């Protein structure tokens, strides 16, 4: 009886079972398509070019679908910032289409020889880039990710399996329908790109545990989403981590330049992962220089958080910092400020509280910048420049699927090469191993 009762308790509702069945069926179909997908570079580029044209040609339909999501978002009380990320208009759709055209211009990584050599016995060995296979994407209310993921997956030879946000349901459905129509017009299966159900969070769990069907899952969104995917997955994941980015101003820095860099990193776009969230001031800086940095931040509309006993002698209107001020992203016009005793204490602070995204330093002393570069734990280190540069396009990689903050497989902005694996090919002339 116990086993019977447990089975009843663990049984899925009909709705939940249908959702799970749909996710697994789509994953199986994606796996079939990926194993048969052999597109050369020209075929990939032609597909992407037609997809870009189709998005612009169907802009009115996309906007109509998007308006449904915006209306629902307003009813649900979404913040203006979320509604802005969700909204599409003709200009934004053209920008998304332009992103696909940019991918066309990128070098196709598939087939690239990473390295090779000939052994003394005449065996010729080479390591060649190959697609990963089925690439799952879990993301929040950014419909542009639907198209970006499609473009990067196709160019790198992968098949995207997309699990977007419920808040962008109608927009994503329309975008994927257009992309599927284009695939069909190229005599390719519509399952070249698929959208998973988004009614419950359980569909995410179905995707990230579909080991053997899905080769990789990449989460893009807030810390809660990323942690849920990374910690709950049995499928390999790449953590596109949050960006609690720091900027250390050394006593050797040009103070006006350093201040400009901090303000750019904080205020250019405060809601992005490469925004500066913490500024660390060298205690050896003269007080007038410290005051100058803090006053300029306030003039730029930034609220200062920190230890009041440390900062009150320098400036007014400081908000007393809590532990979360050091650990969390603000994503707003707020910045945490601490005074540290030199670069070693700055690095120790960063390595304790940072998220391994981007860390910056302003200094003219070579030993100081060298120490920072060597010992700070980060995917990107900005020396005498803004943290805002950590971006695939700015790195010259073209489009990116996210910025990886983990150390295995990929780290930093992920472009096409990071969406591939490799295989070794050994050519011989009948050699047998003794």
Curated annotation (Swiss-Prot):
Reactions listed under catalytic activity: L-glutamate 5-semialdehyde + phosphate + NADP(+) = L-glutamyl 5-phosphate + NADPH + H(+)
Subcellular location(s) per record: Cytoplasm
Keywords: Amino-acid biosynthesis, Cytoplasm, NADP, Oxidoreductase, Proline biosynthesis
Major location (coarse): cytoplasm
Keyword Cell inner membrane: no
GO cellular component: cytoplasm
Compositionally biased tracts (Basic and acidic residues): 16-25
PROSITE patterns the record matches: PROA (PS01223)
Listed Polar residues bias regions: 1-11
Chain's role: Catalyzes the NADPH-dependent reduction of L-glutamate 5-phosphate into L-glutamate 5-semialdehyde and phosphate. The product spontaneously undergoes cyclization to form 1-pyrroline-5-carboxylate.
Stored PANTHER family: DELTA-1-PYRROLINE-5-CARBOXYLATE SYNTHASE, GLUTAMATE SEMIALDEHYDE DEHYDROGENASE
Protein known as: Gamma-glutamyl phosphate reductase
Source species: Corynebacterium jeikeium (strain K411)
């Amino acid at each position: 009886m116990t086993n019977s009762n447990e089975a009843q308790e663990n049984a899925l509702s009909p709705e939940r079972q249908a959702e799970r069945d749909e996710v697994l069926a789509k994953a199986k179909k994606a796996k079939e398509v990926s194993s048969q997908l052999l597109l050369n570079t020209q075929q990939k580029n032609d597909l992407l070019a037609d997809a870009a044209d189709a998005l612009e040609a169907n802009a009115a339909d996309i906007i109509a679908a998007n308006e449904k999501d915006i209306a629902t978002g307003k009813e649900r009380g979404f913040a203006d910032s979320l509604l802005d990320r969700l909204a599409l208009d003709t200009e934004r759709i053209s920008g998304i289409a332009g992103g696909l055209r940019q991918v066309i211009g990128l070098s196709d990584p598939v087939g690239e020889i990473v390295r090779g050599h000939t052994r003394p016995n005449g065996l010729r060995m080479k390591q060649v880039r190959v697609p990963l296979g089925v690439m799952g994407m879990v993301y929040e209310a950014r419909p542009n990710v639907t198209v970006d993921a499609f473009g990067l997956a196709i160019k790198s030879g992968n098949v995207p399996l997309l699990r977007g946000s419920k808040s962008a349901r109608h927009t994503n459905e329309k975008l994927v329908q257009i992309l599927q129509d284009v695939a069909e017009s190229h005599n390719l299966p519509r399952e070249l790109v698929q959208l998973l159900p988004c009614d419950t969070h359980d569909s995410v769990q179905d995707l990230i545990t579909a080991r053997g069907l899905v080769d990789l899952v990449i989460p893009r969104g807030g810390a809660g989403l990323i942690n849920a995917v990374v910690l709950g997955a049995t499928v390999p994941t790449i953590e596109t981590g949050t960006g609690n980015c720091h900027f250390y101003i050394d006593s050797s820095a040009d103070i006006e330049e350093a201040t400009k860099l901090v303000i750019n990193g904080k205020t250019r776009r405060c809601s992005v992962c490469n925004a500066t969230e913490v500024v660390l001031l060298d205690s050896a800086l003269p007080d007038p220089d410290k005051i100058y940095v803090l006053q300029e931040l306030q003039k730029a509309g930034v609220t200062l958080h920190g230890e009041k006993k440390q900062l009150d002698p320098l400036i007014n209107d400081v908000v007393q910092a809590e532990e979360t001020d050091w650990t969390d992203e603000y994503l707003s016009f707020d910045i945490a400020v601490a005074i540290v005793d030199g670069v070693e204490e700055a690095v120790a602070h960063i390595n304790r509280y940072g998220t391994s995204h981007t860390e910056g330093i302003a200094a003219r002393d070579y030993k100081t910048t060298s120490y920072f570069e060597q010992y700070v734990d980060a995917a990107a280190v900005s020396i005498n420049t803004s943290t805002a540069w950590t971006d695939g396009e700015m790195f010259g990689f073209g489009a990116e699927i996210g910025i990886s903050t983990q150390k295995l497989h990929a780290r930093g902005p992920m472009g096409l090469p990071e969406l591939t694996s490799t295989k070794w090919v050994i050519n011989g002339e009948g050699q047998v191993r003794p």
